[in-house]
Amino acid sequence: MRFPVPLVPARLVRRYKRFLADAVLEDGTELTAHVANSGAMLGLMAPGARVWLAPKSGKTAKLPYGWELVEADLGAGPELVGVNTMHPNVLVAEAIAAGKVPELAGYARMRREVKYGVNSRIDILLEDDDRPPCFVEVKNVHLMRAPGHAEFPDCATARGAKHLAELAAEVKAGHRAVMVYLSQIASARDIRLARDLDPAYGRAFDLARTAGVEAIGLVCRIDAQGIEVTGTIPMLG
């Protein structure tokens, strides 16, 4: 995935009300950017941190910029971390189409945002003529508290637990269901559950895995030009 327009470097002032961040451009211009991330973003919000913003245009844009990347030292030295949680679905779909996810290869058709469960939409639905459909739910991973070990979630997520239960129901119905955890931290060697931050999600994950829901970890290469899935990493649960 390439960014459609060049990103603009800035310095973070603060993030507040979940979806807003104040920043200062290199020329001293102060602005407010949209934050497409409802999580706690632990370790990614230090005042003065270097950030990269995407200019927004069009009648629907309420703010002139959206926050895309932040430079953070998560134990392996400064690196770029993707904070926009709107991108993972696109990135995973691209990776599946490019054959970078062997576990999800070979399906004839791919659809996105298909209604299922209780007032939910599955991120990716893979279909074939000679095997059951595969329901794929994607989660963005941007938490790292120990070098190399990415974690999910970074705060309590009742919605995430609901998705796990709905995937388990699909397995019971004879379908295939897969949770994909996408690390937007390139130094991640594996992904683990942050059970201390959301014990309920950990329990829901265990129940889903016992029911037959699969779990896959992916990692990305990130720079100011774009983000690309580079391959799979262990999802340890």
Swiss-Prot record:
It comes from the Bacteria. The gene is sfsA. InterPro entries: SfsA (IPR005224), SfsA_C (IPR040452), SfsA_N (IPR041465). Belongs to the SfsA family. GO terms for molecular function: DNA binding. It comes from Azorhizobium caulinodans (strain ATCC 43989 / DSM 5975 / JCM 20966 / LMG 6465 / NBRC 14845 / NCIMB 13405 / ORS 571). CDD domains: SfsA-like_bacterial (cd22359). This is Sugar fermentation stimulation protein homolog. It holds the Pfam family SfsA_N.
